[in-house]
Every structure is written in structure tokens, then in C-alpha cells.
Amino acid sequence: MNHKVGFVSLGCPKALVDSERIITQLKAQGYELVPTYEDAGVVVINTCGFIDSAVQESLDTIKEAMAENGRVIVTGCLGAKADVIKNACPDVLHISGAHAYEEVVNAVHQHLPPPADPFTQLIPPQGIKLTPRHYAYLKISEGCNQKCTFCIIPTMRGKLQSYPMAQILTEAKKLKQAGVKELLVISQDTSAYGVDTRYQQIEWQGKTVNTRFYDLCEQLGELGIWVRLHYVYPYPHVDDIVPLMRDGLILPYLDIPLQHANSRILKAMKRPASSENTLLRIASWREICPDITLRSTFIVGFPGETEEEFSELLAFLKEAQLDRVGCFKYSPVEGAKANDLDNPVSEDIKEERYHRFMQVQAEISRNKLKNKIGSTQTVLIDEITEDQIIARSKSDAPEIDGLVYLPKISGITVGSFAEAMITDSDDYDLYGDLEYSLA
């Protein structure tokens, strides 16, 4: 019997972690993963349904798999809208929502029974990872308690459920032992970690720690590898983490989605509504940890956004001088409360504002990177091509930030650290020469 499974993972890093967990279970039960539809006995697709373009990509992928294989199991965020999937592809075998690991595995069992002798001994202790060996995503919770009007994540993934502290720290230790040099801490609301447990106390390696964001960062910092924080909602207690960055326990890097700067728009989004307070906090973080890299994301073209309100966002951007910025044009998501707001912004204006926003940020980024010329940066080697080395500094998260390009020399391996002298820069990337390897 064919025990081969095709697997497609779409969407964000949080979905990638879900895929890793499902794949680990399937591999432990003896299934073989194959890269093509035609060789698979069944195909599993982990979908994204956050915005319209993601929904369309998911549906297109399902249709492609149905056309080339015909035996398809669908899971992930779009699975929460089973009717949408059924209308487009009525013959899919099974549909489940996000983080439904056991349900997906059981569906595979039903339509493709597992081998009699699973090869559990072949599964590494850290599980199967879909990232390069030297970095890994560490998911610390599921769901979100926020009520942002542009978002439907709580509908798809439920309320906040923090994973047990000991489970997270054990996974982190296994990843380090497997050679991982960088942990990317992710969730829907990273800084809310532990709220749902009322900061339950646990015993960990002979000491008492609380199930809360600060304690988790502190314990991860003791591993002695890069720890990078993503999706950090700007709660007041986030300020407490910055000294850990200054002291070198975790990377001086904070991914903190701010979404906008105008108070009326922020209130309509149901987000913290004080850009003045945000600017004061940014100044405080930089005073405590001068090397901190601040990344954020913003939405332009939110319903009702006026030219004056957009100009206020640009003014905030210029004053905040954020290091890394992403921007999204508002996209109405089925089920989001923001869809009911008056005065939707036209697509032409959204596009025009997006480009103006990115032009402002490109200049900020260009000037910030120019200031790094002549400095020495610790870099992590991501890739070695025929003619160059591609690396990242402490300021660069994989896939979403810039890169450091270096001339190829012998004795350097992927996943190793090195010191690089920066000699040039552009809008988003750095260029330099290797000084020496840190192994």
C-alpha cells in the first residue's frame, strides 16, 4: 500500500509550526513525505485565511491538488470556513480548523492507513522542522484575546491558550541540542503569554518561575543562543523586557505591530490609541538599550482614513525612525467588524498611500543602514552560493528583514556565526567583509 503523504504549508510562521507538528506525528507513524502530488496517497494542505489574497491562494492550491491527485485533506485557518472550501472543492476528503493536529492525523489514518511498523526511532528529539537547521520557530501559545476590528484570528484560532512553560523550555533545549542557533518566538499575541494561566508558578531546573512573558524570556536567554521576539503587543509590561536585551540575554530586537498612529483610526481598530505615549516608550527603550532594533507593521487605507490622518501616520514614521517596517493595504476580511465601518478607501488611494508610506520608510532605512558602515557586526550564516555568503545580523529576522552579503571564502559553514566589517549598504541590505568566524 502507498503510505506516502504530500504536504503543503501556506501562511505565516505560526502555521508553519502547526505543519511541523502534524508532519512529526505522521513521520513517527511511518508515513513518508513526498514532494509531488502524483506520488502521494493523500495530500494535506495547511491553509491560510487571514486576508482575501491568502484565501484565494489556499483555494487555488486545493484546486490544483484536487486536479493532480484528487485525495485532499484540508486544515488550517481557512478550515474554519468549511463552506467556502466545500463550495470551491466539494470533493475534499476532510476539513478541519487551525491547530487540529489529532483530527488531521486521524483523517490521514482514515483515508490512508498507517504502516504496520512505524519508525518512531527515526524521529529526532526536536521533531521535524521545515526551517533550515540553524534556526527554528518556537510557538508559545495559540489564539488571541484581542478584539482588533480588522482581524478574525480569535474566530479562527480561539482565545489565548498559553502552552505550558516546561513544555516550551524543554522544546527550546532540544532545539539547541539539535544545533539550532536562533529561536524565533512566535504566537498570535506573544507578550500576553501566561495571562490565561494567571501566571501559574512552576518548578524548572531547581527554581520557581512564573508562567509569564518576562520569565519565559529570561529562561530562554539562559540557553546562550539567539532569541528573537515576534508579534509583541505593546502592553506596558513589554518595557520590562528591554533590560534583558541590553544585558545580552535575548536579541535587542522587538517586533511590535503598531498598525497606525492616528488616535481615531486606532480606536476604530480597537488598538492602543496614543502615538505620543508610543514615541515616549520608543525613546525610553533606546535609552535603556541603544542597539535595539524596532520592527513594526502598519495598515494604510483603513475604512474612513482621511488624507490628514494618513499624513499623521507618515509624520509618526519620520519621528519614530523605526528600523524595520512592513505595510499592508487594508483588505476586508469576511467576518471582520471593520468591514461595517463607513467611508471605505478606494483601491487606487490605498495603492498610492502604500507607495508613499514605503518611500518614507525606505529613506529612513537607507540612512540607518548607512550609519552601520565601518561597524563590525556579528552575523549568522544563512546560505553559501557559488560566489557569495548570505548572512543576517542581530537586526535581521529571516524572510522579513534585510540581509548581509559577504564575499565567499573557505572555512565558513551555514549555521555558523562570524564577525563582518560593514563596507556598504542600500535601502534594506548590508555588504561587508568577513573578519573571522566564531564557529
UniProtKB/Swiss-Prot annotation:
Keyword RNA-binding: no
Catalytic activity: L-aspartate(89)-[ribosomal protein uS12]-hydrogen + (sulfur carrier)-SH + AH2 + 2 S-adenosyl-L-methionine = 3-methylsulfanyl-L-aspartate(89)-[ribosomal protein uS12]-hydrogen + (sulfur carrier)-H + 5'-deoxyadenosine + L-methionine + A + S-adenosyl-L-homocysteine + 2 H(+)
Cofactor: [4Fe-4S] cluster
Keyword line: 4Fe-4S, Cytoplasm, Iron, Iron-sulfur, Metal-binding, S-adenosyl-L-methionine, Transferase
Sequence ranges assigned to domain Radical SAM core in this UniProt record: 130-367
Primary location: cytoplasm
Gene3D superfamilies: Methylthiotransferase, N-terminal domain, Nucleic acid-binding proteins, tm_1862 like domain
Domain TRAM residues, every copy: 370-436
The EC number(s) this enzyme carries: 2.8.4.4
The MTTase N-terminal domain, residue ranges: 3-113
Metal-binding in keyword set: yes
UniProt GO molecular function: 4 iron, 4 sulfur cluster binding; aspartic acid methylthiotransferase activity; metal ion binding; protein methylthiotransferase activity
Stored Pfam families: Radical_SAM (PF04055), TRAM_2 (PF18693), UPF0004 (PF00919)
Enzyme class, first EC level, given as a word: transferase
SMART domains tied to this protein: Elp3
Any one Gene Ontology BP term: tRNA modification
InterPro entries, A to Z: Elp3/MiaA/NifB-like_rSAM (IPR006638), Methylthiotransferase (IPR005839), Methylthiotransferase_CS (IPR020612), Methylthiotransferase_N (IPR013848), Methylthiotransferase_N_sf (IPR038135), NA-bd_OB-fold (IPR012340), Ribosomal_uS12_MeSTrfase_RimO (IPR005840), rSAM (IPR007197)
Localization of this protein: Cytoplasm
GO cellular component term, pick one: cytosol
Family in the record: Belongs to the methylthiotransferase family. RimO subfamily.
Protein name: Ribosomal protein uS12 methylthiotransferase RimO
Origin species: Legionella pneumophila (strain Paris)
Lineage: Bacteria, Pseudomonadati, Pseudomonadota, Gammaproteobacteria, Legionellales
Gene name of this polypeptide: rimO
